[in-house]
Amino acid sequence: MNYPAEPFRIKSVETVSMIPRDERLKKMQEAGYNTFLLNSKDIYIDLLTDSGTNAMSDKQWAGMMMGDEAYAGSENFYHLERTVQELFGFKHIVPTHQGRGAENLLSQLAIKPGQYVAGNMYFTTTRYHQEKNGAVFVDIVRDEAHDAGLNIAFKGDIDLKKLQKLIDEKGAENIAYICLAVTVNLAGGQPVSMANMRAVRELTAAHGIKVFYDATRCVENAYFIKEQEQGFENKSIAEIVHEMFSYADGCTMSGKKDCLVNIGGFLCMNDDEMFSSAKELVVVYEGMPSYGGLAGRDMEAMAIGLREAMQYEYIEHRVKQVRYLGDKLKAAGVPIVEPVGGHAVFLDARRFCEHLTQDEFPAQSLAASIYVETGVRSMERGIISAGRNNVTGEHHRPKLETVRLTIPRRVYTYAHMDVVADGIIKLYQHKEDIRGLKFIYEPKQLRFFTARFDYI
């Protein structure tokens, strides 16, 4: 495997340091064994998320100085609008403060209580907004996506037979829309093939069902298509992205990932009537339709960053840096979700902590142990993130119980990946020392963000 060097020079740095293990243990205890509740100053290498943790370019910083902070009609909005229309091909764009702002708008605009939303695996905030507006989420991702050890391409594809069965059983009129994520975060950052997007479009169009993409990591998805799908090897990333969205009616976007910024998002659609309603609704929750809760400078940085993300050298390095970490861990026998996706390496906590049951929260405990032993912050993505069934109150029990090592864009080097790998490999050699956890505080909504735990 060829791992390309960073396609950038570092112009500004932030000093970080490793606090002693006994202090890390104390900090973890104070945080209730929830890595979300740690203070960033106590983190050596922060792999909690790739959301808003990107390093911006010199051109983006220059653009920040060109912020038009007019309350309405900001020139930066029009720059962002033109950029998204050109690259994605959608007719309308509504800016939001981040991705979940767009999820909130779409859910209110598109869902009637009692309808179904089908998608290729749930995501935490996305499903929350869908259910909050009365929908029932139905997972129609291919079965292979739930098998952590299965190494095949495009595990994020929608199972067309599952989709057809849902249409036959529930009726097309009772399906609000299809939520197609590119890539599928909780499956390990798995991509969706262009062939599958095209097939989903053909099937839904025949039944009058709309398709909205979660476009958060669309550039990473495009890279996998270029790398692995026949007929796209000679196409540019921008060309692939544009074709991807030609099979959708709109999308939600968290600009904090593939737009290479620290804040921002947007909702896209082609339907004029929906756009009119979205402009009315965004004023209530975000702000004027020309800023959506964002400063002008942030919209400018997002427009510039989205173009930078289309550069092949950037996205090749981005994906292969993640793959480098995964390959090191796999070579040492550490169980991971395969194949390695575009934004993170997912540790398979079921196999890593095989001495713990799912009710002992192995992924949560593993994430806490990783911080204590290595100074690296990661994130639980298992039963805690899945939450509870709204009707029964029982835990959702995902087949995948993982810890996500999420790599921020343009922030860390291969040397940092070596440090992460070495620390986790060492921890794996003493995995039986990892103890199970129990709730001492469980929030009712999106519990993984603020829950607290203690050892059983």
Curated annotation (Swiss-Prot):
GO MF terms, alphabetically ordered: tyrosine phenol-lyase activity
User: According to its UniProt record, which cofactors does this protein need?
Assistant: pyridoxal 5'-phosphate
Gene3D superfamilies from the entry? Answer: Aspartate Aminotransferase, domain 1, Type I PLP-dependent aspartate aminotransferase-like (Major domain)
Enzyme class, spelled out: lyase
- The answer to keyword Lyase applying to this record is yes
- Subunit structure of this entry? Homotetramer.
HAMAP family reported for this sequence? Tyr_phenol_lyase
Name assigned to this protein: Tyrosine phenol-lyase
Q: Which organism is it from?
A: Citrobacter intermedius (Escherichia intermedia)
Originating gene: tpl
